[in-house]
Amino acid sequence: MEKIIRQYFDCWLKKDIVPLKEIFADNVIYTECYGPEYQGLDQVLRWFREWNEKGTVLKWDIKQVLAQGNTLAAEWYFECNYDGAVSGFDGVTLVVFDGDGKIASLKEFESKAQHHHPYDCR
């Protein structure tokens, strides 16, 4: 399962849509961290094509992966240039795989990359 999520992130780094057809189930539900939800492989492919026309993923570094049964959680750092603006954030992806080893459900969650320490006494 970890190999598949790494392959998926690599698709973004290389702007390579071809492997997505083998990574995702036809009936996948993909929920982005800021609200959009893509229903089915066709919508995921459309989003991938359209996003990559305006943006480039600069980094998608996996920090850790936890897997149990058919479920995987990956913590990562993501950075991109979209419409000329570079931004990045920390995040977590929760993935459920189907019986064929394809991604049936993927949900992303975002956290600020910059942290502050409100109780730091320095």
Protein language model regions, located:
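A short gly/proline-enriched turn/hairpin at secondary-structure junctions
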Residues: 29-39, 51-54
